[in-house]
Structure formats: structure tokens, C-alpha cells
Amino acid sequence: MSQTTSAHNEILQGPILSPLIRFTLPLMLSLLLQALYGAVDLAVVGKFSSTASTAAVATGSQMMQSVTSLVTGLTMGVTILVGKAVGAGDFQQAGRIAAGQIKLFSAVAILLTGLVTVFAPLCCRWMNVPANALAQTIAYIRICAGGMVFITAYNGISGIFRGLGNSKSPLLFVLIACIVNVFLDLLLVGVFHMDAAGAALATVAAQACSVLFSVLYIRRRPLPFVLARESFRTRGCVLRIAALGAPIALQDFLVNISFLMITSVVNRLGVAESAGIGISEKLFVFLSIIPMAFMSALSTFVAQNMGAGQPERARKSLLIARRISVVFGAGIFLLTFFGGGLLAAIFENDPAVIAATAAYLRGSSLEYLLTPAIFCTLGYFNGMERTPFVMIQGLASAFLVRVPLSYLLSLMPGADMLVISLAVPISAVVNLLACLIYDRHLCRSLSPC
């Protein structure tokens, strides 16, 4: 509780750079561990199983990421509202928001479990999953769907902590999950050769352990508010969470669907290309950790400062985060352009898969120069409760640029992974332009910039 109070005070007063970095670093480590969490499945299966199993885990994990994005999007609504309540010093309201989240997320977990289990085969066929990987992909998705309750619980608890200004506790929760997942992956896939199903079972078990640990953690270190019965009787908080989180959830989900559509286009090229684009998407999660962490940090920073009536401080935090992220983005651009093959070799031994992955990374490398500014600006918009714009720009760039352009490029004579991947940085340019234009408009409406 004292850790939460200290972090809250740093966010609202004093220098910005130091507390912003202190808050962001645990988020970076959390994202790194989450990326490792998913990548370990792919790496272990790639080393101990067939290429078909690798394609199954790559495609199946992409589908589950799309579903999970609905939960993480709603979680952002919780983080923003808790942050704003804490910034205003209203911890009772923060408790009501947490109670509303529990009600909403319980319903979401049940609904998603049923839908994913039933429609897994249809989704796999729609994505043109190679025939020799179809059965394993369906099994992977259905097993992971059985752990949806743990996914929603973990995200919900972590969202509350981040809204309070505490990014260290969620890091501890995901560390537990990562350790359990690595151990079980090596056991179930490496020793018992359970292929994609073993990787899925390891994932679900790790998530369950993480949630159990987080509940025990809260019992020993209570939150700075009480979840009283009266808190659960307030319906307005559920609607507010949905109003703020639903646009982000819908945007994240449909943008993930757009990448699945691109995967569907690539899957027609063969199993090696199918595995290659799956590995490329896994690498994106690793390589975008810094801007994604700043995006999450800014959502809390901005929400708390707006709740405290300090819009100028919120604006300064955006400018600082954007500068830091862009510097790192330049380094990632060079790495993906020149070292894609080395990155791919971490996950796969097959030379054809490595070549396909390297080609896709080279073509999409320019994206890593642009996403730092995009993600930081979106985090600022989230904290300002401008989530409808976040949704609109994301959907426009995905479905008006990225998907149709990928399809058109795939129809070109001799089209390969390099050619198709060019749609990604082109859509990122559209993203950035939209964000900068809206940011300028928002800045002028608040105060002279």
C-alpha cells in the first residue's frame, strides 16, 4: 500500500522523467516476460516437433492473441478510470470501478470460452491453415480457450494495480506464469512430445498459477480500497468501463483480425511461409516492447494527472516518452532490416522458415521507426479518454490500407514474403499521420501548443 501511495505521489508531482521511467521499466519487463511466455511455446515446439506443429502454435497463438485483445482492451478502461479516481483522491470510486470490473469480466470470460471452443474449426479453415497443421491448431486453440477465465482474471488484477500507479506487482505475477510455462513446455513438449497440445496445456496451467499467486498476494498486501457489497450494486461503473474500454477492445481485436487476414493470404504460399509470418508476429511483440510499455505507462500517467487537474504535466509526459521511444525504434529498424535471419533462427531450424521470416522482417522493418511515436501518442489519447479516435484510426489503417494492400501485393507476379510485408509500414504511415493531425487538434482545443 505504501508502494502504491509513493508511486501515486511521484506521478502527480516533481520531475517527470525519473518517475516515468521507474513506472515504465516494470511494464517493459512484464511485456518481455509475456513475449517470452508466448515465444517459449513456439521455440520449444520448433526445436522438438515438426514444422506442422510450429505452424499450428504460430497460427493458434495469433488467434488467441486476437481473442485476448478484447480483454486487454477492456482492461485499459479499468486502468484509465482507476487512475483518474486515484488522481482525484477518490479511492471509494476506485473500489466501485474494481467491483464493476469483476462483474463485467466474469461474463466476458464465460462468453469467450464458449465462442472460441465452438468456432475454432471454422476460424482455422477461414485462415487457410495448412491441412497437415489443421488438427493441431484446433486442439491448441480449444485448450487455450479453457483457460480464458485465468486470462481475464490476470488482466483485470493487473489493470487495477497499474491504475493505482503500481507496475511492479503485475511484473511479479507474469514472472510466476513465465517460470511455470517454461518448465511445463520443456516437460510436455520436450520430454513427453505432446506437440501443440502440450504447449497449450503449459500455457493454461501457467496462467492459473499466476492468478492464484496474485490473489494470495492481495490478501497479504491489501489494496488501498475496500470491495464492499455496496460496491457491487453500482451498475454505472460497468457501463463506464465498457464505454471507455470497448473502443480499445474492438480496435485491438479487429486489428489482430486484420493481421490474421494477412496470415491467411500468406498461408496460401506454403507451410514454411505460414510458420515464418507466425514467427514474425511473435518477434514484433518482443521488438515493440519499449513503445508498448510507454503507451501503457502514459495511459496511467495521463489519467492520474487529468484527474488531478494537471493537463500540462500530462502533455509533458507524452513528449518525453515519445523522444525516448523513437531513439530505440531506430535501433530496432536496423536490427530487423539486417539481422532478420539471426532473429528467426532463435525459433526455428528449418532454413526455408528462416528465409521466409527474414524476408518479411526486412520488408516491414520501417514500421519500427514509426510505431514508437504512434504508440506513445495513443497512450496519451487513452489517458485523455479519447478512445473512440484510437479505435477509428486503428480500424481505418488496418482495413482500408493494410489488408487490401497485402492482398493486392500478393497478386503481383512473383509475389513473396518481402513484397507482401510492405503493406505493414505503409499502413503505419497512415497511422502516424492520423495521430499527429488529431494530436494537434486536441492540443489546440486544450491550450496553446
Which residues make up each language-model segment?
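Short runs within selected transmembrane alpha-helices of multi-pass transporters and secretion channels
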Residues: T75, C144-R162, P170-C178, A199-S214, ...
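Small-residue-rich hydrophobic transmembrane alpha-helices
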Residues: T54-G114, V118, I151-P170, I277-G340, ...
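Transmembrane helical elements of multi-pass membrane transporters/channels
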Residues: R22-D41, I143, Y154, A177, ...
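Residue-level signal for short hydrophobic patches within transmembrane helices
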Residues: Q13, L17-L36, V40, M63-L70, ...
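Short alpha-helical transmembrane segments in multi-pass integral membrane proteins
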Residues: M1-T24, V82-V149, V191-A246, V302-E367, ...
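Transmembrane alpha-helix boundary and packing residues in multipass membrane permease domains
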Residues: L27, L31, A43, I80, ...
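Small-residue hotspots at the loop-to-helix junctions and early N-terminal turns
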Residues: S49-Q62, T137, I141, A200, ...
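Helix-terminus/linker motif at the lipid-water interface of multi-pass membrane proteins
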Residues: L36-A55, C124-A131, L187-M194, F253-F286, ...
